């Protein structure tokens, strides 16, 4: 019927090549040199295949990534905020134990327990947060503001780690991110789903999950590039490790602050307008 079959593996192949073309150069650019023909060629391949993937998906019956949804401005806002809200986790999961062990000098056991209080928070708080968010539409943007703010500020605080810093700072900071994660889990996906037509909810939800996974992959590559830039000369030097870890945390915090700005100046007016329309319709 002149339509591209969604059973074709071509879409998935284009996506894999596009992501590899971008993520691999980000991971190895520091060690191989950013002007290396291999690195530059990888970026070129990534860009070309990204364009090809978008063109292919635009004509697919059931695309892997529904391009048409990006024309929905409200939905796009929530996808971007969700993407940003996941970004800091690449710093938290990898570089908090690294900083605790190699900069502060804590034991492996203490470093391994850093996220234990955070885990407890994320087990119980989402129930309370979800009940609060569901009371009225205005609480949705407040939940997103809490999510971004309580993800950004702990990362910024951890960005000033020194050998004399107490490991208690990491415990407190990561516990606060547990509060952020609890509010993220009950706000991003429901808010995005509310912007979609019933027939688009399934694939729209899948796209949100894809954006979250992509955020983690990009974060790992970018943070690895930053850390390697400081430690490539001497990976065992404490000062180099400290500078690398701190820069990673500050970068994660700065990116999440961008998410907070988006919530305050894009998502908030959008949801307040939507709430006003709901009142008028009633």
Language-model features: where?
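12-transmembrane solute porter fold
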Residues: 37-38, 62-232, 242-271
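Hydrophobic transmembrane-helix bundles of small-molecule transporters
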Residues: 1-81, 88
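Intrinsic disorder in cytosolic terminal tails and internal cytosolic loops
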Residues: 266-282
